[in-house]
Amino acid sequence: MPAVLYEARDRIALITLNRPEALNAFNREMHQQLREAWLAFREDDDLWVAVVTGAGDRAFSAGADVKQMGEPQEERPRPSFWETRFGEDLQSGLEVWKPTIAAINGYCLGEGLTLALACDFRVASEQASFAFPEVSLGLATIVGAIRAPRVVGLGNALELLLVGDRIDARRAYEMGLLHRVVGHDAVRSEAEALARRLCRNGPLAVRCTKEVAYRSLGLAFDDAVRMGESMRRLVNSSEDAREGPRAFREKREPKFKGR
């Protein structure tokens, strides 16, 4: 049975973490297959938005598979002071400029929470719970500690990262971690509805705007403007940039093609 399911439908990629018997915990196979899924989505010009969720009705992902931590690991380079990313995927920095949505249908812990934070939108069940429990196991959280403050602010991030206790969906929404909280059975449908709404917009304009929003966080304002204006010129020369105003004048829905 594949550890990750991948389905393409109506401009939307549906990615499912598929280890429900282990609460969709990450093992080596899931890491590899999830990376392949993100790459397939990124490179497919016919797909404009991705939704990632967990199989079953108990968990988005319970994080890293602790049982596998004691198993022999593949040979890796000896640690050095100058560390680099190993096995890059979405949560650790794989660049995907199309919109991504996490449909959180239960436990969202550790690496599962890091994956959710790497997505642009987070829709959660009212029964979902969230935590970075690594510190309770004597383990450090690295990528989650980098991503969390950018989403929920430093104070809220430290509550999650250093205390390690679970919080419910209501508290997560108050923190700004979640965009929407819905009934347990409505998580996937709500996420897919959001994906369809995003697909109504010009995909090149959406990707450009997302990339500018993220990249500008690390730039001086003037440098960010220069980068953004360069990207905008490329988008404005596209067929979609002509179709949008034309459709507005003709009082009809635009038919964007992503080119």
PLM regions with names:
Residues I15, R19, L34, V52, ...:
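Terminal peptide-recognition signature
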Residues K210-L219:
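Short, charged, surface-exposed hinge/linker loops at domain edges
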Residues S92-V206, E229, S237-S238, R242-R246, ...:
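Crotonase-fold acyl-CoA enzyme core
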